[in-house]
Amino acid sequence: MKDLLGFLKKQNVSSDFDTIKVTLASPEKIRSWSFGEVKKPETINYRTFKPERDGLFCAKIFGPIRDYECLCGKYKRLKHRGVICEKCGVEVTQSKVRRERMGHIDLATSVAHIWFLKSLPSRIGLMLDMTLKEIEAVLYFEAFMVVDPGLTPLEPWQLLSEEEYLDAMDEYGDEFEAQMGAEAIKKMLQAIDLDAEATRLREEMEATSSETKQKKISKRLKLIDSFVQSGNKPEWMILDVLPVLPPELRPLVPLDGGRFATSDLNDLYRRVINRNNRLKRLLDLMAPDIIVRNEKRMLQESVDSMLDNGRRGRAVTGTNKRQLKSLADMIKGKQGRFRQNLLGKRVDYSGRSVIVVGPSLRLHQCGLPKKMALELFKPFIFSKLQKRGLATTIKAAKKMVEQGLPEVWDVLDEVIREHPVLLNRAPTLHRLGIQAFEPVLIEGKAINLHPLVCSAFNADFDGDQMAVHVPLSLEAQLEARTLMMSTNNLLSPANGDPIIVPSQDVVLGLYYITREKINAKGEGKAFSNWMEVQRALDAKAVHVHTKIKLKIEETVIDDAGVETVKKGIVDTTVGRALLLRILPKGLGFDLLNLNLTKKNISKALNACYRILGPKETVIFADQLMYAGFKWSTLAGLSFCSDDMLIPDDKAPIIERADEQVTEIQRQFAQGLVTEGERYNKVVDIWSHTNELVTKSMMEELQYETVTDAEGNEVKQTSFNSVYMMADSGARGSVAQMRQLGGMRGLMAKPDGSIIETPITANFREGLNVLQYFISTHGARKGLADTALKTANSGYLTRRLVDVAQDVVVTEPDCGTDASITMAPHVEGGEVVEELKERILGRVVAEDVAGLDGEIIVEKGTLLDERLVNLIDESGVDAVKVHSPITCETKFGICQKCYGRDLARGHMVNLGEAVGVMAAQSIGEPGTQLTMRTFHIGGTASASTAQSQVEVKHEGKVKFDNLKTIKNTENQVVVTSRSGEISILDSLGREKERYKIPYGSMLNVKDGIDVTSGNVLATWDAHTHPIITEAEGIIQFGNFDGAVEEHVDELTGLTTHVVKSSKERSSATKELRPYIQLVDDKGEVVPFPGTQTPAMYYLPENSVVVVNQSDKVGAGDILARIPQESSKTKDITGGLPRVADLFEARVPKEPAIMAEVSGVVGFGKETKGKQRLVITQDSGEQHETLIPKWRSVDVFEGERVEKGDVVVDGNPNPHDILRLLGVERLTKYIVDEVQDVYRLQGVRINDKHIETVVRQMLRKVEVRSTGDTSLIKGEQAEFARVLEMNEKVSDEGSVEASYQRVLLGITKASLATESFISAASFQETTRVLTEAAVSGKEDKLVGLKENVIVGRLIPAGTGFAYHKARKEASEKTQRELAAFMNTDDESAVQEEVVEETISVTESVEQTTE
């Protein structure tokens, strides 16, 4: 048995651990680390440069300076290893022990550890239930603490000031004991009985009902519990012994010129030792109390600054007024241990150089300069030369390489064959920023890069540099080839579209040869194959753009993989016919038989990838690139200033605008419009003018008139170079062409507001001085923005990666039935993202049935392009799919809930790090987003005041949740608040959807057909009507003093306006005017179908449009409430908006939502607030207080559902989660984030955002504890609570209840289970303090922790390794358990030994 345990012990090498635990160090522990006490502040002798004995660099304590050599030189050489020199006391061993041997300082008095004192919340303060101020008063010798009151009336632990202490001494003499400093605090901490205290707090928690008290108690209880569980003792937060860092980690290096550079820590240690020695001497001399006290305070301060300089009081500075770097500073921040050395290391076998274009390379190649290759592959070359017998020793080989003999180059050729290298361009924003290529040796000093991978690297050739890395081991080479090769990364992980797409001159060349020209040379000829066309072109019988007829015979493969042979004659052009040569077999000619713009090329490549697979796609992409370069060279497109056409009607358009502006200025001068209206109108006019000029310019640019073969004049698409460049997608856009040939338009000031005088000139005409000055205004802001944006975007990416890093695909199926519903994404009434795009690559959670009820797709199927098209054609408009949000896997996520791996086009593999992929996909386009906050003004405000809904597509009308009544004029009036109208196409799919506001007039009936341009409904955009649903006679109530009459001078009509409460007298302040309906007999009329009397309360400022005793019918308007223009808030756009969403920030003025479902009423108002009361069906009432200045969107007697918005504003995500649940929250965040990215034309798949939201929802708040060990009100990990509940429900006990909590990404990262990961992210001090106090264990499950401890990450190829290790250790434990439980020991013993040996071998193999 002993042998066996010994054997197992041997296996437990220090590098083979599964968890890392951090706890408080006891004084004994610190002494056990130490190799001796540091007694003197001296470092080295200034003459001999040898370390001083007992000093900070003492060789006796820390080990020898030179390998195997003692300090005095008595023992030298390896043979004396382990001897301790009797003269100088140094052990003869390797000098590297100076990196690991620690020393210690025995402190003359106890000192508090600043981290546990000042890192909020103060742990010492929580433990003692005292405030930080009180503790600091004791620690820094400003107050006494009663340690033992004896028989005096003083309280134990009472604080006494100096005077009070002296008074007490006079009164009671020596009957009591009071102390100051850390000793007093230490005594107090020692006196705490943790178990008894915990029990007392638990009882107190049950007894109290006050929320604040409960919170306070739970905080303390948590701390005490963590002390009990971790085995830490509270008094260890006070130090008696200070450990001293090994000297090599705080080096002292001689500079030339006889000076020394030293680590700041040495200075800090010196101060501590000096003060400690002085204090010891003072204590020996029995110095007066006040001197000793002062020295103790100074010692406390010097230990504080050594541990964390600047945390308390002024930071200690060195000679050059620079703050000294303390121990805490060593580990935190970008330059700290975590981020500088553990997460980012420098590597050997790497180099960097400028990149230049390599148009003749193939996609998997890169050009590597010979010089670089020779340097990078040196060790390989040496070994090859030796193997060949060309060199006898490494030294000889080295010489050969230095001389540059011809044999060396031959060997180099052999070495690099099939040996991939990695190319990386900083900043590496997503995983495509590092890719593997096969090197091709080239002359020169620049790396040649294949043009098609530029978009993945975001590289251009204006002086960019790239780094080269050599994968050394066989495994590394294998991974580089199979996973990182550029030919294996054709699709973007963000959206699944091809990322290897031609751009710029390649696109231009392809576009050029696929254009057609009317009446070009040889038009109408017929050819039997592309070779004939080539010969005709060579013979100059036809032109590249000539329209011809071509006989084709091709094999076409469709989505389902079915081959069909197509024959026939097609109309095409010479250029397109030539492209037939490179078209892969299986694709139809119709993919290339059109103008090849960038979009069309992308479509062709996508089709090729889906139908023929990656290999064909790579070849096709390369061939397209060669053709594009060839033809853009032959075309020689360039442009001159005459190509930028200025439209003839530009001048009259601008004149008209000037007249309109003058007219508005005149109205303003007469006081007819306000300053704001004038500004908005002017900006509107100029925006509109700019559009008109652009439109007219584009019409001139886009078409040119030519004569066809019959001699008629016809229009054809223009061959203007500028237009061709923009139309093909090679370079430039309409916006840029507008500035060249139209007008520059309105400019913005740096604060985002628009300057109302536009630049009417364009760049071809040239700008005058004023216009030039205005344009520099905006341009400078643009440059400043870009710099800020890069930093902000990088920080967002960092936070996203940190929160999502440990989401890895860990199992095939979590077995959940939960799902989310996917529907087309509608914005502004139009479908911006179709259903088929949203569900592609998802797994369906329920059978999908067509309109006729037959099942199209079965539950659990992964949707590919074919199935998605099937669903689309069958007219299904919503599909339930699995999502990362609903996945129930405890650690990580399952394949089924994630679906397709976008970068590979098939089901995601086990071990795929989908979290990091999600974070990179969201973060990478961050730099393309805008930074500005939009002030609504000008064009934006014009679009907000909508007053009707127009149909855009023809189709069938469908009402959704609409309540309507007919009024006396037979118009249909809408009386619902959340009603919508959809337009369905012939298959019943939703094409458009519109919200129809309360009080609109409907022009259509449910189910009728409409065509585009039909108006569905109209309403007044500036007022909100109150509409009667019953008919009867008007009777006013509470009008006296609360309502004033206005008589219109022109018409003589009277209207009643409700006064605001500020304008009323105190007697009428509380009155609430209302209108009620009575019948002929004076009885009150009820609402139709109810017993409730028809009363309409009138809010402030509403204008009553009926008079006393008027007769009204259902659907008539009683009053109008003017809508304030308070809706023009600033819209946060771009990057800040995305950051706000992911940080789950509460908006400035959040929308207030109904907490329960029921009927709205208003209660008694307070001074600044109105009281909204919702009465539930059960009769219970729920009250909400709303500030007076917020406009309430609902009216008395109206029914609301839980989660409906009652006060307008930006929704608060926490409210959405609480009231509407996880799915609605996910939908909100996904839609909002997508809106920002869509505005910039960036496509990101929803599931990336869902993955991040999943991580934001990791925590729950415990509502009731049940029979678990949780504490009420604490935040716990969702997976852990589920696990505990499973455990107690199996035992038949009560489960804990909880509520999901939404955390922002920064908070979620810091709240992760792994303290190593959290500490390396932000707030290192706080995280480590907390971890140490609670004795946290890091199970090393995430990626980051494993990188930090230098392991393979548990993802990708490391996933299998970790799995094997886990299984092996589980097996060993099982065997050991069985072994302990059996009687027949010897038999099992042999078995276990064999098992263990085989298990360890298998682990070793996996590691290798």
From Swiss-Prot:
Annotated positions binding Zn(2+) 2: 814, 887, 894, 897
One CC-aspect GO term: DNA-directed RNA polymerase complex
One Pfam assignment: RNA_pol_Rpb1_5
Binding site for Mg(2+): 460, 462, 464
Alphabetical UniProt keywords: DNA-directed RNA polymerase, Magnesium, Metal-binding, Nucleotidyltransferase, Transcription, Transferase, Zinc
Domain of life: Bacteria
Record keyword Magnesium present: yes
Protein's GO biological process: DNA-templated transcription
Record text on cofactor binding: Binds 1 Mg(2+) ion per subunit. Binds 2 Zn(2+) ions per subunit.
Enzyme Commission designation: 2.7.7.6
CDD domains xref list: RNAP_beta'_C (cd02655), RNAP_beta'_N (cd01609)
Catalytic activities: RNA(n) + a ribonucleoside 5'-triphosphate = RNA(n+1) + diphosphate
Needed cofactors: Mg(2+); Zn(2+)
Keyword Iron annotated: no
An example molecular function term from Gene Ontology annotations: DNA binding
EC top class, as a word: transferase
Positions of Zn(2+) 1 binding: 70, 72, 85, 88
Known role: DNA-dependent RNA polymerase catalyzes the transcription of DNA into RNA using the four ribonucleoside triphosphates as substrates.
Record text on subunit structure and interactions: The RNAP catalytic core consists of 2 alpha, 1 beta, 1 beta' and 1 omega subunit. When a sigma factor is associated with the core the holoenzyme is formed, which can initiate transcription.
Family, as annotated: Belongs to the RNA polymerase beta' chain family.
Descriptive protein name: DNA-directed RNA polymerase subunit beta'
